[in-house]
Amino acid sequence: MSEGTLYDKVWDRHTVTKLPTGQDQLFVGLHLVHEVTSPQAFGMLKERDQEVAFPERTHATVDHIVPTGNRDRPYRDEAAENMMAELEANVRGSGIDFSDPDSGNQGIVHVIGPEQGLTQPGMTIVCGDSHTSTHGAFGALAFGIGTSQIRDVLATGCIAMEKQQVRKIEVTGELGEGVTAKDVILTIIGKLGTDGGVGYVYEYAGEAIEDLGMEGRMSICNMSIEGGARAGYVNPDETTYEWLAETDAFADDPEKFERLKPYWESIRSDADAEYDDVVTIDGSAIEPTVTWGTTPGQTAGITEPIPDPDDLPEEDRDTAKRAQKHMRVEPGDTMEGYDIDVAFLGSCTNARLKDLREAAAFVEGREVDDDVRAMVVPGSQRVRDAAEAEGIDEIFIEAGFDWREPGCSMCLGMNDDQLVGDEASASSSNRNFVGRQGSKDGRTVLMSPIMVAAAAVTGEVTDVREMEEVATV
């Protein structure tokens, strides 16, 4: 087993006891709650006449079902209104801080945690959402959990978990023009597979990772679960500390920041740490990358041919054939030129201010293709407000994008923003499963925000490097 890694250090410091099951009981530093996976857990507490053990370590928001258009209450969708009302009652009855739509702080749970400084290095973080691994970008151990585990954490502040192995993924070299963190993680999943990380936590390292800002690191850690890993993280460094210093937690309390910084530095993986596996990927060889199929592992560089299923391992052939039939693609073709109907820029993977800035810089002076409906859904109210202060909203609106309120939106078919029929979308989200964006016949192509912007203006999947004024992001 691994030794001397950040994962080992943080795990050991949060272990309360070894359980008879062989699992460890871990103390949870931060529990993030949203409207979809928490009602049943709160209901179980009420049945047992239990209270939330650590409301001060719990924070709630609404994101999955909240409309990104008309937000007048009651919501048009009765189920959404009921979930919202139940969350409001549960959190306020428990004394839990709530970033509600009237607070100015509402947003996707994995966007608001980092921007408010709730997410910090060396913490254990859980949430009833698959993409909780996002917070690992700060050097935290962050895990998605199920309903019964949500109940356990609410009631005790602890969770039972089995320790994983640690795989170090080194991305060496410098990323090229038009290549982003999203391309890096799609490449990693494409190489290792959607189940390649089962039993592992991923530590991301190497020059290409170190050169990324926090937004890029969050995009990579966000999709760790899509590669089968239980979590993913990046060791904290000066880039991390600079972000944290400007958050609510520390902007007005620099002394607190200085007190905690030595701890953050101490949890970094040792120079001689031992890993269970090490994978090295040449970052300079990565090109803009998109999905061609119906899993995040079915990827190809924009100039690479779609594989022939018969050339794949036997266990992957049938899945690939079904995916190619659904997506209407042929082996040997590339995804460049694939027609799209919808361009979606949003989700917990890619809806932060930097994502919007870079896409807007590309879009400025261009127009959305006449046959494309395009939308931008900021990750939080703070992101939206900051973007509007910079005039980013006007750039998108003038180009023909719909500028919306924050929420999960078209990442999943759980709100009003959905594909219709067999529409094909260029999406900056994290999952391209059949039916994920609301229509069982819909087709989703995952890509970076700047690639979404390029697809929106051309009406097809486009190699952004072939267009003018492309920045390295």
Swiss-Prot record:
Cofactor binding mode and count: Binds 1 [4Fe-4S] cluster per subunit.
Where [4Fe-4S] cluster is bound, by residue?
A: C348, C408, C411
Q: What is this protein called?
A: 3-isopropylmalate dehydratase large subunit
Give the transmembrane region(s). none
A Gene Ontology annotation in the biological process aspect, one of them, is: L-leucine biosynthetic process
Cofactor(s) demanded = [4Fe-4S] cluster
The UniProt catalytic activity note for this protein reads: (2R,3S)-3-isopropylmalate = (2S)-2-isopropylmalate
- PROSITE patterns from the UniProt entry: ACONITASE_1, ACONITASE_2
Which GO molecular function entries does the Swiss-Prot or TrEMBL record give?
3-isopropylmalate dehydratase activity; 4 iron, 4 sulfur cluster binding; metal ion binding
Q: Where is this region: Disordered?
A: 289-319
What is this protein's function? Answer: Catalyzes the isomerization between 2-isopropylmalate and 3-isopropylmalate, via the formation of 2-isopropylmaleate.
